[in-house]
Curated annotation (Swiss-Prot):
Lineage: Bacteria, Pseudomonadati, Pseudomonadota, Gammaproteobacteria, Enterobacterales
Species for this entry: Escherichia coli (strain K12)
Induction pattern: Expressed equally in exponential and stationary phase in rich medium (at protein level).
The protein, known as: Protein YtgA
Amino acid sequence: MSIIILATISTTQENK
C-alpha cells in the first residue's frame, strides 16, 4: 500500500 503511494509521488516529482 505505502509502496504504491511512494511510487506515485516519485513519478509526479520526476514529471515536474
